[in-house]
């Protein structure tokens, strides 16, 4: 404020440098912290700077370098429903089996499934969900989405309206992710379970704003401190981070029990990376090691994925799959969820070239995922929304892989339920329907194992034991 110093963050820590009134440096910079610093703010008297470090707010005094904590009274309490809910399923896809179970009662106590038994009228005590004319499935899981977490309560309703009860955010503002996770967990807002991380860990020249810029491998430890303090569910490295530094990130993240994903297949696979995002996508090499310019992947790509056990999140939709599905079936846009949550979606569709060229490009890319599954690899379902609309993009991703790539409907449904849950390390908590699991369910009006388009027809959603009808989600909270 007095015009004599500029405060800035470099190499992850806080510095000041003396300047002229015109902003020219007058001397060497002075380092103020040895810990990560975000959002520095000058005090009005220019005597101190307030900054955010991992999970604390602190003040550093310029006179003597003293650092003090600023107490912030923040707390939250997880909301767990009580009571009994019974879902009477005409048919049940349990997340794993190739065939449906018929006439099943799913008994929920609080937020856990306690029984999955053949229908028995004597079990029907408590809140009853009549799904006798539908197919019950585990809640769907969106494994690659970003943004809009601070935009209000509507986004949570959007996800749930498409049957999505868990989302994974592989890059985002870490404090937005924590706030959304805690708000939903406390019951203040409704929405899916949120699993996420902070900004991407990138090189000295970042690709996207919000990324952590690592000038050297020495910063890796600082980033891992933040990851541990904010309880990241994963770490994502990005396209300008050198391979050697990525290897160190993988080692240190694994020591914390956190998986690592990136856009890179090789040498990331040799360095122990756990996942790869996008069949296409940007790369630090300037070209993709996963797919050619014609959207074709060679057999070595399939073999590396299948034999390593790395997960791959396709996001075929952002490479033309979403546009092709909607052009082939524009009735998608008549859905009340689209008109309510994504009214501009029809105007945003762009094909890559003419229709037949677009179709061939999508078919070639989507078929890679079928080949990976057939070779024993792990495909999870994600979209990179909101490039394409949240919720809708996951349904069209599933359809694109089945319709254009030849993936079976059972593999598409498993990828969006049990396989994605297991890939996040929560296969014993959700993603399938059996006693002991968290009560995350979706009721479809038809059988997605017969026709994947049935995944569009969401009637009822159960998230953490709480029942939501589609009409309720479309209307929003009472005013």
Locate each region found by the language model:
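Multi-bladed beta-propeller domains
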Residues: 1, 10, 16-39, 62-79, ...
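Hydrophobic beta-strand positions that form the internal "hydrophobic ladder"
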Residues: 3-6, 49
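Acidic, glycine-enriched loop/beta-strand segments at the rims
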Residues: 93-105, 118, 389-392, 407-413, ...
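Divalent metal-coordination and catalytic microenvironments
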Residues: 57, 90, 106, 111, ...
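Residue-level detector of Asp-centered blade-edge/turn motifs that repeat once per structural unit
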Residues: 1-2, 44-45
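Divalent-metal coordination cores built from histidine and acidic residues
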Residues: 131-143, 147, 151-262, 266-281, ...
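Histidine-rich, glycine-flanked metal-binding segment
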Residues: 98-137
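Active-site neighborhoods of metal-dependent hydrolases
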Residues: 223-241, 282, 287-405, 478-479
């Amino acid at each position: 404020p007095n015009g004599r110093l500029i405060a800035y963050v470099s190499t992850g820590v806080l510095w000041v440098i003396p300047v002229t009134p015109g902003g020219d440096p007058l001397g060497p910079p002075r380092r103020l912290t040895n810990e990560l610093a975000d959002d520095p703010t000058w005090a009005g008297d220019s005597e101190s700077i307030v900054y955010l470090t991992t999970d604390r707010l602190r003040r550093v005094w310029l006179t003597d370098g003293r650092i003090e904590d600023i107490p912030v009274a923040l707390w939250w309490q997880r909301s767990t429903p009580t009571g009994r809910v019974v879902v009477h399923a005409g048919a049940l896809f349990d997340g794993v089996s190739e065939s449906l179970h018929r006439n099943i009662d799913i008994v929920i106590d609080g937020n856990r499934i306690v029984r999955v038994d053949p229908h028995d009228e004597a079990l029907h005590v408590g809140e009853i969900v009549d799904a006798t004319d539908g197919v019950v499935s585990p809640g769907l899981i969106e494994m690659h989405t970003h943004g809009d977490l601070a935009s209000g309560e509507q986004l949570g309703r959007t996800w749930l309206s498409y049957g999505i009860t868990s989302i994974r955010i592989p890059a985002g503002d870490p404090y937005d992710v924590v706030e959304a996770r805690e708000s939903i967990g406390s019951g203040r807002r409704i929405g899916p379970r949120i699993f996420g991380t902070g900004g991407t860990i990138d090189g000295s020249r970042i690709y996207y704003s919000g990324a952590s810029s690592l000038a050297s491998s020495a910063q890796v430890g600082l980033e891992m401190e933040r990851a541990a303090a904010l309880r990241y569910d994963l770490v994502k490295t990005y396209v300008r981070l050198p391979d050697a530094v990525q290897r160190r990130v993988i080692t240190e993240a694994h020591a914390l029990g956190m998986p690592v994903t990136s856009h890179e297949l090789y040498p990331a696979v040799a360095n122990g990376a756990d996942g790869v995002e996008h069949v296409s996508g940007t790369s630090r090499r300037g070209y993709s090691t996963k797919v050619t310019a014609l959207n074709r992947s060679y057999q070595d790509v399939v073999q590396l994925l299948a034999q390593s056990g790395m997960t791959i999140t396709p996001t075929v939709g952002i490479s033309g799959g979403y546009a092709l599905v909607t052009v082939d079936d524009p009735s998608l846009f008549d859905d009340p969820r689209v008109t309510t949550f994504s009214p501009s979606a029809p105007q945003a569709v762009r094909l890559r070239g003419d229709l037949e060229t677009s179709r061939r490009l999508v078919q070639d890319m989507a078929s890679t995922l079928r080949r990976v599954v057939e070779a024993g690899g792990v495909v999870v379902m994600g979209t990179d929304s909101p490039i394409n609309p949240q919720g809708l993009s996951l349904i069209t991703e599933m359809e694109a892989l089945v319709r254009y790539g030849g993936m079976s409907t059972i593999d598409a449904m498993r990828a969006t339920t049990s396989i994605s849950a297991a890939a996040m390390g929560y296969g014993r908590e959700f993603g399938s329907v059996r006693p002991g699991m968290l009560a995350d369910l979706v009721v479809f009006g038809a059988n997605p194992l017969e026709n994947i388009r049935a995944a569009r027809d969401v009637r009822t959603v159960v998230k953490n034991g709480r029942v939501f009808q589609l009409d309720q989600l479309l209307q929003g909270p009472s005013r």
